[in-house]
Amino acid sequence: KSSEITYKNGKLEGLMTRWYEYGQKQFEGTYKDGKEDGLFISWYENGQKEFEGINAGGFQDGLWKSWHTNGSKMAEENYKDGIRIGTHTFWYENRQKKGEYYYKDGRVFSSRCWDRNGNKTPCNFHPLKRLFK
């Protein structure tokens, strides 16, 4: 099977699970009244976790974490009702910190960035361009 989904009154309800064609779990998340609500986890084809976070009423809420395919941390991001808040931190695959962005009222208030060797550099990476699947 490739996915398992439950509907109630024509809307997604409960646990939704998807698998890669060879059986490895790809995605798992819960829905309530058709909206994403609860824990969401995605995995790469190699079995390594890709991202994990909570949705509430269809919006990202709380801490979201993501990882590179090699298992090293990619990002830690904070949300409230789908709006970016507080510090969002990003890393390169070599575990070197890439950037820290501080959000206030959903907008970048300040930022600091580094190159792959740990040297401070202008922030030309923008976290909004990185999308979850």
Kindly label every feature range from the protein language model.
Residues 1-133:
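Glycine/tyrosine- and acidic-biased, solvent-exposed loop/turn segments at the edges of beta-strands
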